Amino acid sequence: MQKEIAIPLAYFITFTCYGTWLHGGKITSVDKQHNIPGTEFVLADANREASAKKRLVEAPYLLDHAQRHIVLDAIKEACTFRAWILLAAHIRTNHIHLVVHATVSPESIMNTIKSYASRRLNESKLDSNRLKRWTRHGSTRYLWKEEDVEVTIQYVIHEQGDPMAIFENKSRESFAGAVIAP
């Protein structure tokens, strides 16, 4: 007998640009000891942050206006090609937020998105000498309830400061159909 695997309504995926969001810095972060929703983040620690900075192999990576739009287009391309439903995306200067419905793992989505974005950035020749653009992993949250999906989309689109490169799927019909399909 085959075991049914529960698929969440969507995933909330966040990843940062290389060297911009270091453990111990003033910006909150998670690590292996601080990764349970609702618990404390990594505390600010100047020594830990300085140690992380020393380990960087190149300068921190920031996305300018043109690069953010290249990344957004690459994300839409990847989602279309893989038949994933992109519900929301916000490409910031130093991090990316996505809300995606898919039947694969959020880690697979994140890795694919990073690959597509890097490929398109390489083709643009805006920063082709970079070795590293993205942090090694990121945050992957499972959204099981419609309310959680809507709240997360609101956060991604409207609660990040001034809009940068954004996408919001206004049509939830395609999403609803995908959710109830076997």
Where is each model-derived feature located?
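Short catalytic/metal-binding and nucleic-acid-binding patches
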Residues: M1-P182
